[in-house]
Amino acid sequence: CYRKDMLAAAQLTPPSTTEALVKVARQLHDPAKGRYGIAWNAARGTPLGHTFSFLMAKFGQPIVDLPLHAGGFDFQNASGEQLRPMFQSDAAYRACEYMLDILKYSPPNILNMSWYERAQSYASGESCMAYCYTLLAPLIEFDKRSPAYGNTGYLSHPVGNHGRAITPIGGYALAIPANLSKERVEAVWTALKHLTSPNMSK
C-alpha cells in the first residue's frame, strides 16, 4: 500500500516493479522529518522468512524447485528434488539484494518489525509505503485519526526481473515435518494441496 497524497505531492507514480519501488522509497525517505520510505516485515525469524519467500517469487522462483507449466508452477504434482529449497538460486540472491536496498529507506526499528509494527508504522504516517496484508487493514481503513485514512492506494506486490504479479499464499507455515510417520504423510500432503488450491485461495 502507499500514501496517494505523498506520491502525488512528489509527482511520483505508484511502483509496479521492485526497481521502481526502491526509487520511490528513496525519494520519499526523509528521516529528519520522521518519515521513512517503506515498512515491511524484517524481524528475525518468521517475519523475515515470510518476506524472503514471497520476494523470491517476485523474482520468478518459488522457494522450492517447482516445475514450470503454462499457468505458473505445478505444486500439485511436485515430488523428490522438486521440493528442495532454492536458497542458492539467482532469485534468492536478488531477493536478498532487494531487501538490503529497501533496508536503507526503512524505519530505524525495521529489524524488529513484523506484521503489527509494520501496519502501525504505515497507519501512523511514519512510513510512506508498506507491504500490506488485509488482516490489519482496519488500522488504515477504519481509523479516521490515521494520516493514511482515505489516502491509501493498493497495488499488487511489485515484481522483479523474471517475476510476475502473483499473490503468494501460505508457504512459511505449511510444511510436512521430517519426523512425521510415513503412513501420515499422504494424508497431510492431501490436506496441504486442498488448503492451497485455487478454490480455497479465493
Label for each model-derived stretch:
Residues 3, 17-24, 48-55, 92-99, ...:
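Stable alpha-helical elements in mature extracytoplasmic
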Residues 2, 132, 195-196:
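A conserved hydrophobic position in a structured secondary element of the catalytic/binding core
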Residues 94-190:
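Extracytoplasmic/periplasmic substrate-binding proteins
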Residues 1-16, 41-80, 168-177:
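Periplasmic solute-binding protein
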Residues 193-202:
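Periplasmic-binding protein-like
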Residues 24-27, 66-112, 157:
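Glycine-centered hinge/linker elements that transmit conformational signals in sensory
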